[in-house]
Amino acid sequence: MTDAAQHPAQTTPDQPAATPEAGADGTGAVNPQPLAERVDNRSQRPASNAFRDFMASGWAPSSQALPDPDASAPYAARRRAAVSARFPGERIVVPAGRLKVRSNDTDYRFRAHSAFAHLTGLGVDHEPDAVLVLEPTDPGAGDDGTDHTATLYFRPLAGRDTEQFYADSRSGEFWIGPRPTLAGLAARTGLRTAGLEELESAVTKNVAADGTAVRLLAETDQDVDALLAAVRTEAGVDLAAAAEADAQTAEFLSELRLVKDAWEVERMRASVAATIAGFEDVVRALPRAVGHDRGERVVEGAFFARARLEGNDLGYDTIAASGNNATILHWIRNTGAVRPGELLLLDAGVEDDSLYTADITRTLPVSGTFTDVQRRIYHAVLDAADAAFAIVRPGIRFRELHAEAMRVLVDRLDGWGLLPVSAEVALSDEGQHHRRWMPHGTSHHLGLDVHDCAQAKRELYLDGVLEPGMVFTIEPGLYFKEEDLAVPEEYRGIGVRIEDDILVTEDGAENLSAVLPRTPDEIEAWMARLQA
């Protein structure tokens, strides 16, 4: 990384560092330089007018051609219409979020809040500090006959005659590449666009106890939170009621994603396809992983390369767990060895450029073949997954998937003599002994977040009724830890999970990840082919 400030100081970055001044008390003590300015202490930056003038001239004109509309634009407009219908007469403020600091002056790659992406259709790294505002109108006078007009406020491309072009390492074109123009992003999204300098007025105008009610997707952009909190307080708005309204807004925006539209399903298919390619890369890399002290990192790296090649990023931290590490549900350190004879549990997903992610798990024999005990445990988990999938159809309740999978696992555990009670008692609310070896849920919604729709009401999620267009995982598992004295020694250190991404259709379900081998025989043949 170049030796320059990732975060520009309060002064312009081409100014020389401030010179400390002697204290006013006559002691000669030096006032400390403000910390915010010390980012400039490591670099010499030109401050001459000649430099500024030279930087501002001699550039070819930027293209004025406008991009085509995004394929997501009409779908995003329908989602905004649903928000408008739910909250007539109220201003809705949905920030994208801000750049997050990894350490010191180094940021993480930007990833917008999922609600912002859902309502704008924007993916990849669009757009730090942006805010979508839905302004109430008279009934039917808004966009496409809705009750709101939508405007996207963001920081557009700066002219090459400005200091931002070359001096702002967070947003300047010289540092991070071209940014969209107001007209360009309007063409892509179908939204009105405006610069961030207009945001404060748009968010705060007419806010009063008897004025325009404002709903905010809170805890997404701290500056917007602070701005609206100050205005609400000054205007005498009931802060408790406003906080409850904000929570209801987050809830609704989460529930709006429970059923995916055709464009969303298409993007999730792309995420699944890229993820399957990543699993194939891992199988090819397994011989190299076996020869490395931290073979799990070899596995993780092989998958990450595919995620960046075909997608935006990982949908979540990869779980590459070999041997006893596979009994740790969210093992993401991936510092362990990958040893012959062990099982490798790989739980990974590619996030598409649209920000939709897959979430798939396979448990693979490192040596290419399952032992008898590994196969026995694997088949129990596979049977549970198949049983849950078999009942998926519109009209059943989401919670039934878990119950069906648990019935199968309890039957197998009972048959192996592992339960200290009868199968009937184990399945009762007062029992649940089987959850010692399967402590997590069987399913979760999937989409823009790996655990999508997380703020939805219980009656629409766990107790909800399945509808066509819902996408969720089915992922039972069994985990027998090395130190578990309640199971035979031959079971210890074995963890198995099988996870697929399921789309509810009009008359049943489709396993979006079914092309990835699932049975022990299929897995062994697949691995042999890829490693030949």
Task: Give a label for each model feature.
Residues 1-532:
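Active-site neighborhoods and metal-handling regions in enzymes and metal-associated proteins
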